[in-house]
């Protein structure tokens, strides 16, 4: 596809927005899904102060802004801010005219029907796109791994899902959702660092803690044993320099933080961990396809990027599954972007071209067309 009419692929995550052109092997633009508004009145005349900032600019000015995430738990909750993010994506990041390109958007599994309709409406009525499509995130991740059957454990910043897929179709009755993801782990790390005597409270400081989490945390293969090691020696301690030059030391917090994925009780939640949720999802499927799911368990999303997570999943699921079952956890190195990559693959397939919802179809049927064409 030539750049002129290439389809645009936008993966709107709770934490990061990934955007680019179909056919590319990686997104061109990756920026935080944040809209920031000034906390104080502007006093410098002629500074060209704006009433809102999006993405990296909001991130860099976070000290004077109140930051809001319009996507919570994978689902859009603030449409005005969401529109700002899309506007920023088209005009500032990709520098394209949306009325000239088909747009592929992604959505969380079990997204409310009204949400997909609203997305469709905004694309056609606000941005005048010639065509659009809404695809389920986990399905795209599976495409990116070169499979059509498997179970995807997709965990991002706002929500975690386990989605069994057979021959390209998601099995909705077996999809499970866990409202425990990266943002909760960041908040938990803030809490346990506060117990150490470091104070992180504002939205701006939360971003510092997110960086600590991404750079230093890992998943222990055996949590109790790791705790014992941490208690008896300083071999697991690492230091981190804060923006103001202060250096903090972090020890067992490094693996206590992501351990909450396997033991949600750490966060005071009564739900099952990601290993049990994956197992339960497989058990909701037909007995004949379970073998294929166990052997094709694909991890996707930024919250699966912790070192050690695949080995731990392998160990935990092996303990739950029948003893003779072959279990394979696939953790592609590019899994942070695998939803976007799958979208790029899908939107550039020749067989996909008849799947787009065209402006004409939208004008004839209205927003509900999305339920008939996107499944």
From Swiss-Prot:
Instruction: Reproduce the UniProt comment on modification after translation.
Output: Oxidation of Met-44 and Met-47 by MICALs (mical1, mical2 or MICAL3) to form methionine sulfoxide promotes actin filament depolymerization. Mical1 and mical2 produce the (R)-S-oxide form. The (R)-S-oxide form is reverted by msrb1 and msrb2, which promote actin repolymerization. Methylated at His-73 by SETD3.
GO terms for CC? cytoskeleton; dense body; focal adhesion; plasma membrane
Spell out which residues are annotated as carrying N-acetylmethionine: 1
Q: Which class of enzymes does this protein belong to?
A: hydrolase
Grouped into one coarse class, the protein's main location is: cytoplasm
Tell me which UniProt keywords the record has, alphabetically: Acetylation, ATP-binding, Cytoplasm, Cytoskeleton, Hydrolase, Methylation, Nucleotide-binding, Oxidation
- N-acetylaspartate-modified residues are 2
Documented EC number(s): 3.6.4.-
Q: Which residues are annotated as modified residue Tele-methylhistidine in the UniProt record?
A: 73
Please name the Pfam families in this protein's record: Actin
Catalysed reaction, written as an equation: ATP + H2O = ADP + phosphate + H(+)
Residues recorded with modification Methionine (R)-sulfoxide: 44, 47
- What GO terms are given for molecular function? ATP binding; hydrolase activity
Compartments where found: Cytoplasm, Cytoskeleton
- Subunit record text: Polymerization of globular actin (G-actin) leads to a structural filament (F-actin) in the form of a two-stranded helix. Each actin can bind to 4 others.
The role this protein plays is: Actins are highly conserved proteins that are involved in various types of cell motility and are ubiquitously expressed in all eukaryotic cells.
State any further remark. Answer: In vertebrates 3 main groups of actin isoforms, alpha, beta and gamma have been identified. The alpha actins are found in muscle tissues and are a major constituent of the contractile apparatus. The beta and gamma actins coexist in most cell types as components of the cytoskeleton and as mediators of internal cell motility.
Belongs to which family? Belongs to the actin family.
This chain belongs to the protein called Actin, cytoplasmic 2
Which organism is this protein's natural source?
Pelophylax lessonae
Name of encoding gene: actg1
């Amino acid at each position: 596809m030539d750049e002129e009419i290439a389809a645009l692929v936008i993966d709107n995550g709770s934490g990061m927005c990934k955007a680019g052109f179909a056919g590319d092997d990686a997104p061109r633009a990756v920026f935080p899904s944040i809209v920031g508004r000034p906390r104080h009145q502007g006093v410098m005349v002629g500074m060209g102060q704006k009433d809102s900032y999006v993405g990296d600019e909001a991130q860099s000015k976070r000290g004077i802004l109140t930051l809001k995430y319009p996507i919570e738990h994978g689902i859009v909750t603030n449409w005005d801010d969401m529109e700002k993010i899309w506007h920023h994506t088209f005009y500032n990041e990709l520098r394209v005219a949306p009325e000239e390109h088909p747009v592929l958007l992604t959505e969380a599994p079990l997204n409310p029907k009204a949400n997909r309709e609203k997305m469709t409406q905004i694309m056609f009525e606000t941005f005048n796109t010639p065509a659009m499509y809404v695809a389920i995130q986990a399905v795209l991740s599976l495409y990116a791994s070169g499979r059509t059957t498997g179970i995807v454990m997709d965990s991002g910043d706002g929500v975690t899902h386990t989605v069994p897929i057979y021959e390209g179709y998601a099995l909705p009755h077996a999809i499970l959702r866990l409202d425990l993801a990266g943002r909760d782990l960041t908040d938990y790390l803030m809490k346990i660092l506060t117990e150490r005597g470091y104070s992180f409270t504002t939205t701006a400081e939360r971003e510092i803690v997110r960086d600590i989490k991404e750079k230093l945390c890992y998943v222990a293969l055996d949590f109790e044993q790791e705790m014992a090691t941490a208690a008896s020696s300083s071999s697991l301690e690492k230091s981190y320099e804060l923006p103001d030059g202060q250096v903090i030391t972090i020890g067992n917090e490094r693996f206590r933080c992501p351990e909450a994925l396997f033991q949600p009780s750490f966060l005071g939640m009564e739900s099952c961990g990601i290993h049990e949720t994956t197992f339960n999802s497989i058990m909701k499927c037909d007995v004949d396809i379970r073998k294929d799911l166990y052997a094709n368990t694909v991890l996707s999303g930024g919250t699966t990027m912790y070192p050690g997570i695949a080995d731990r999943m392998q160990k935990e699921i092996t303990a739950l599954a029948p003893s003779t079952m072959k279990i394979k956890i696939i953790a592609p190195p590019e899994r942070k972007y695998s939803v976007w990559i799958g979208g790029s693959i899908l939107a550039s397939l020749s067989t996909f071209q008849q799947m787009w919802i065209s402006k004409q179809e939208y004008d004839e049927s209205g927003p509900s067309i999305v339920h008939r064409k996107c499944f």
